[in-house]
Amino acid sequence: MAPPKFTKTLLARTRGTDTSARRRAESKSQRSTSSRYPIIQTAKLHRNKRNRSPAEPSTVVRRRNTRQTPTETEESTVVCSQTRRRQQRPQVLVETVNRDKPESSSQRAFYLQFIKSIFELGVEGIVKLYNAELRAYFPANITRQAFDKNPTKNRYSDVVCLDSTRVKLRNWSTDYIHANYVKTEVLTNSGFICTQGPMTTTVCDFWHMVCQEQAANIVMLCETMELGKEKCQQYWPRRMNETLEFPGFRIRNMGVDTSDSVTVISLLEVRRVFGSEVDSVSRKCKPHYVRHHLWKNWPDRGVPSSTLAPFRILAQVRPSTSPCVVHCSAGIGRTGTLVAIEACLQTLLLERPLNVVEVIKELRSMRIHTIQTDLQFLFVYKCLIAQGIVRGILPKELGSVSRKFSRDYNSLLATRLAVQPKAPLPTQSPPVPSPIRYPC
């Protein structure tokens, strides 16, 4: 087959000379040297570009690069320069810790030791520990001035909102909302915002807080009605494509996920409304999207039947870089229980000594009254055990001890908890409220 045209031209230029073989050998040597010494080859290329004049013929450049193999001096210079750069580069140690479950061998061993300490304490010992250390515990040097100045915005007069950690609303008609930041050293990202269930007088404040803090998740641990009593205002639309309006806000349900047996997850679109209708200014404002997690049928001042549902919820909200808003009715019992489970789990995953009593005391210094009953305190331990069992941490020889703990736990619940009827979910969405009903 005849060679291409450009190949014929190249052969014509080099025919009759004895340099073609030498050039091929040089090209092969250059490729070999480039693969072995890429730094040297790059340095030579830059040096040639600096020394070459615009009028200099290309043949001169080829003569300057005839020596392709580096000398021992060049090799030692390159090695020394590379070593010097490595020594000058700061050493950064990256901590790779699984923050979702005990996965490494050291995490699993540390987790197992804690579970053994729970079995040694027993159900009765845990209840006694709560009564002795936490039942009457209040943090020292607390102030409640904002709480006392806003009685109409507090759901319960005996559930105090601390001044030191309260969420302050900005660019709003008031700076007060019954909500506190809960941030500890072990909690990931921005921690939690623990708050009471929205009221008719605070529902607009609630949505303003969600937008202000750019919260990506809302965890609701109560029903709007429980045992015939209102525990929380209907502040979000339950069904897909339904809309609920409040003065200044329009909330739309973008989708509902009911695949979990315990929780209902809704994707909500929150838009600010600056007039009676969505005017041109309102349309230009970007909507805020938030996932709403509703835990069905967690009894007030009690404990739910599922001990693994907390970890499923926490795994969904943990990746967010913004604080997670958590509320029940008062925002201290069920809310504090979920936050305590996360704080205890993260302490164990970081392989730090865990004292659950001290964890609760630290949480109460930010959100007072965290965990209201000894059963909720016991539920924290039970969930941590369940997590260890489902991860296969418990050996077979601890099976009998684990079953005894479960029997004692169930027996205590049977004697302490009265049978409570479950409040059914509403069959249809509530009507759109009027601004008069919600004096925000």
Q: Whereabouts are the PLM-identified features?
A:
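Cys-based phosphatases of the PTP/DUSP/CDC25 superfamily and their flanking regulatory architecture
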Residues: M1-C440
